[in-house]
Regions:
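Glycine-rich phosphate-binding loop
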Residues: 124-149
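ATP/nucleoside-binding phosphotransfer catalytic cores, i.e., glycine-rich phosphate-binding loops
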Residues: 183-186, 190-242
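Glycine-rich N-terminal segment of FAD-binding domains in flavoprotein oxidoreductases
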Residues: 26-52
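Class I SAM-dependent methyltransferase SAM-binding "motif I" and its flanking Rossmann-like core
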Residues: 140-185
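A glycine- and small-aliphatic-rich helix-loop capping segment at beta-alpha/alpha-beta transitions
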Residues: 45-57, 80-82, 144-153, 213-215
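Ligand-binding beta-strand-loop-alpha-helix segment within the catalytic cores
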Residues: 56-129
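Short beta-strand segments
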Residues: 33-37, 65, 102-103, 130-133, ...
Length: 242
């Protein structure tokens, strides 16, 4: 595990974008595992800046996203399909045929999970997986106590996750989807490099627990202690307890 300490959110975003940029430059046809949520947005902004400056070319890049809400049409403004297009895909030259997310409108969970696992296999696996971390240690939508050996699966979101995500749905908990498709821990651990971004004092406790405590399904992110190429990039507040 490599830890990169940064002074603030902007610096964290810049460092994370540097690592992703290097991956694209070194392997133009790389497979990027991408994440949603507030934390990676700054890194995506930096990647768009570098693309606009002529420093990055996404034309051969393939993306596979971590997760998607089940039952939400992709055109919904809070679907992760919409999030990724709004924050990254619409602003760079990635081939739409190379963009992959779970299909939240496929209500046949078994078939959709099997399909998405096959998509990831067919592109050769993930070269670099970007992650955030939840206050309870979840990564993707792998919630506490989920088995470490799962591939893509359908999950019932915990009340804590639903509460955390209601800010994206006008603060109305009833509008937040209650299920999601997510890459499993096994899939994440098979990525050749894993990059986690974390910021703010609110994440300090879980960072300490996940990366300096026992490896346990109770804290899904703790498994990353065992990954051979895991980079944690955080600001001073998030890393204040380690």
């Amino acid at each position: 595990m490599k830890i990169i300490r940064t002074k603030d959110y902007a610096d964290m975003s810049r460092k994370a974008a540097n690592i992703i940029s290097a991956q694209i430059i070194m392997k133009p046809d790389c497979v990027l595992g991408l994440a949603t949520g507030g934390t990676p947005v700054g890194a995506y902004e930096k990647l768009v800046e570098r693309y606009n400056e002529g420093d990055l070319d996404f034309s051969e890049v393939t993306s596979v996203n971590l997760d998607e809400y089940r039952g939400l049409p992709k055109e919904h403004p809070e679907s992760y399909w919409s999030f990724m297009h709004r924050n990254l895909f619409d602003h760079v030259n990635i081939d739409p045929a190379h963009i992959n997310l779970p299909d939240g409108t496929n209500m046949d969970a078994e078939a959709e999970c099997k399909r998405y696992d096959e998509v990831i296999r067919s592109v050769g696996g993930v070269d670099l997986q970007l992650l955030g971390i939840g206050h309870d240690g979840h990564i993707g939508f792998n919630e506490p106590h989920d088995a470490f050996d799962l591939g893509t699966h359908c999950v019932d979101l915990t009340q804590e996750t639903i509460e955390a995500n209601k800010r994206f749905f006008d603060g109305n908990v009833d509008l937040v989807p209650k299920q999601a498709y997510t890459m499993g821990i096994r899939t994440i651990m098979q990525a050749r490099k894993v990059l986690m971004v974390v910021n703010g004092a609110g994440k300090a406790e879980i960072v300490k627990k996940a990366f300096f405590g026992p490896v346990t399904p109770e804290v899904p992110a703790s498994i990353l202690q065992l990954h051979p190429d895991f980079i944690l990039v955080g600001d001073e507040e998030a890393l204040s307890l380690i």
